Regions:
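Blade-level signature of beta-propeller repeat domains, shared across WD40, Kelch, NHL, RCC1
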Residues: 428-459
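A flexible loop/linker signature enriched in serine peptidases of the S9 family
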Residues: 176, 188-198, 214-217, 234-243, ...
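Amphipathic beta-strand/beta-sheet edge segments enriched in Tyr/Trp
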Residues: 24, 85-167
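Hydrophobic beta-strand positions that form the internal "hydrophobic ladder"
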Residues: 183, 231-232, 272-275, 316-320, ...
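Short beta-strand->alpha-helix linker/helix-N-cap micro-motif
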Residues: 27-90, 103-109
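Residue-level detector of Asp-centered blade-edge/turn motifs that repeat once per structural unit
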Residues: 177-179, 226-227, 270-271, 314-315, ...
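Short loop/turn segments that connect beta-strands within beta-propeller blades
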Residues: 203-207, 247-251, 291-295, 335-339, ...
Length: 459
């Protein structure tokens, strides 16, 4: 019995235990190797905001370049220097240096410590102003505007840079941004035989890294709620794996139910009102759904095989999970209400297998867009991060390494973060990759790091 429970936990943690036609837009789904040339001069600074303007401009440039979809023009090449938020730029000067888009902005700092930015995005080739969809602060309605503006406390100045970068990214790609968000992960330190694992959090670009726990107990697989203020994770506190909630507002931790056996592999439902998880009892692992308000649970699977690593679809109607009911770890999909569904094979069942390739599949996670499921695959001695359609079609492997594990989606469903060990004995590091399999980047952390999870865009 203990052996089957340990296998269930290993399946769950995977290998870690071993616009207008004339306007320019970026298509980020076709895998183009040519990034959009964009000029972002330092924003003009009001009194006392000179350093803030420089820093905010730098973060905006770094955010956009980090996606691999933009190339910033070297400021040394700029011809026009007398830019103003209220004046049309000399487009010919920017065409000469091959810029397709131009961002002009201003930063001010008032006596109450509030930072404000105002910016415009210009289509250099089309010779016109990009219109932005913004939320009117008076009516709370979305309206079209010739530019964007944000206000925030000085201590949170990086957020105003990320928000501005998100607005630029959204206007030029057509997709939601990802920069004004956070990543929670497991910070690892110490020798392999006595590893200290702490819950940690940072901005999407690696800034403002903070440890949330002290590392007295082993912690795995943190996951964000849709409110971005709660994290669920598995901890070995008390000597057995159990699912916990961590409140980011007050730092309070609590056990999610006093279940017999072990609970692990937690993940929030899309509406944030429930947590789906695995429970191992009497040698068997099945899936359960807990209502966070009533703390009532409902059993989702009842099968002698190991069912683990559940993840709900964007609309909450379905669950994907890993099961060895077919003889090896594979990915399955079921309806959340337990009703039968039509499988890719044409028959009906309560759970349909959607992976049939060589190797073992684990850690499936549904895209927030609803169209893809990311997974870890082990085949021929290598590990891969991949994606597959929810109907089992179009499997694509995006990465390959000695160990790649734990995929997690960006808020817009266009980027996947995961952790990698490049060789035996190497500590885990966080990486991200886009859906084209390009733009593989290491996310810098102060320690070794594993089990990343991306928050929604911050409120």
């Amino acid at each position: 019995m203990l052996k089957r429970i340990l296998v269930a936990v290993m399946l769950f943690v995977g290998a870690s235990l071993s616009g207008v036609q004339a306007q320019i837009e970026v298509d980020i789904t076709r895998g183009s190797d040519t990034p959009l040339p964009i000029a972002i001069p330092d924003f003009k600074a009001g009194p006392g905001a000179e350093e803030l303007a420089r820093q905010i401009s730098e973060v905006i440039r770094n955010d956009l370049v980090s996606t691999g979809r933009f190339k910033t023009i070297d400021p040394a090449a700029f011809i026009q220097k007398d830019l103003s938020i209220s004046l049309q730029p000399r487009f010919a000067d920017w065409r000469i240096i091959n810029s397709d888009a131009l961002v002009v902005g201003e930063v001010s700092l008032d006596s109450d410590g509030i930072v404000s930015t105002v910016f415009r995005i210009w289509d250099v080739q089309g010779g016109e102003l990009y219109r932005l969809t913004v939320r009117d602060s008076a009516t709370d309605q979305l309206v079209e505007s010739g530019g964007g503006n944000f206000r925030i406390n000085k201590d949170d100045w990086r957020r105003i840079a990320h928000k501005t970068a998100d607005a630029i990214y959204t206007r030029l790609t057509g997709d939601d941004g990802i920069f004004d968000s956070r990543i929670v992960y497991i910070a690892e330190s110490g020798p392999k035989t006595n590893r200290v694992k702490r819950l940690a959090i940072m901005d999407s670009d690696g800034a403002n890294q903070v440890f949330l726990t002290e590392g007295r107990n082993r912690i795995l697989t943190p996951r964000f709620s849709t409110s971005d203020q709660e994290i669920t994770y598995m901890s070995f506190e008390g000597g057995r794996p159990r699912v916990y909630l961590f409140n980011l507002r007050n730092g309070r931790q609590e056990v999610l139910g006093n279940f017999p056996g072990m609970t692990f592999a937690p993940r929030f439902s899309p509406d944030g009102r429930s947590v789906v998880m695995s429970q191992a009892l009497n040698g068997n692992s099945d899936l359960y759904l807990m209502d966070l308000r009533t703390r009532q649970t409902r059993r989702l699977t009842d099968h002698p095989a190991i069912d683990t690593s559940p993840s709900m679809s964007a609309d909450g109607s379905q669950v994907t999970f890993t099961s060895d009911r077919g003889g090896s770890p594979q990915i399955y999909v079921m309806n959340t209400d337990g009703s039968p569904l039509t499988c890719p094979s044409g028959g009906q069942d309560k759970a349909c297998r959607i992976t049939f390739g060589r190797g073992n599949y684990s850690t499936p996670v549904w895209s927030p867009r609803g169209d893809l499921i990311a997974f870890t695959k082990q085949v021929r001695g290598k590990f891969h991060i991949g994606v597959i359609g929810t109907d089992g079609q179009g499997e694509r492997l995006l990465s390959e390494a000695y160990l790649d594990e734990g995929p997690a989606w960006s808020p817009n469903g266009r980027v996947i973060t995961f952790f990698r060990e490049s060789r035996p004995g190497a500590g885990p590091k966080l990486y991200s990759i886009d859906l084209t399999g390009r733009n593989l980047r290491q996310l810098q952390t102060t320690t070794d790091a594993s089990d990343p999870a991306w928050s929604p865009l911050l409120k």
